[in-house]
From Swiss-Prot:
Signal peptide: none
Family: Belongs to the DEFL family.
Lineage, top ranks: Eukaryota, Viridiplantae, Streptophyta, Embryophyta, Tracheophyta
GO biological process: defense response to fungus; killing of cells of another organism
Description of how the protein assembles with itself and partners: Forms oligomers in its native state.
UniProt superkingdom: Eukaryota
Sorted UniProt keywords: Antimicrobial, Disulfide bond, Fungicide, Phosphoprotein, Pyrrolidone carboxylic acid
Disulfide bonds listed in the record: 4-51, 15-36, 21-45, 25-47
Protein name per the record: Defensin-like protein 2A
Modified residues (Pyrrolidone carboxylic acid): 1
Length: 51
């Protein structure tokens, strides 16, 4: 199943913790996965959802 990226709607500020970002995406936003990705000009928490 293809996953599409979407910036986290509940994360604020710079993303410096992959585990915290992933947990927040999964628990709060019902995403499949999450990670800190560099999106100019800073790292952001990106959630991955089924497309």
């Amino acid at each position: 199943q293809k996953l599409c990226q979407r910036p986290s709607g509940t994360w604020s500020g710079v993303c410096g913790n992959n585990n915290a970002c992933r947990n927040q995406c999964i628990n709060l936003e019902k995403a499949r996965h999450g990670s800190c990705n560099y999106v100019f000009p800073a790292h952001k928490c990106i959630c991955y959802f089924p497309c």
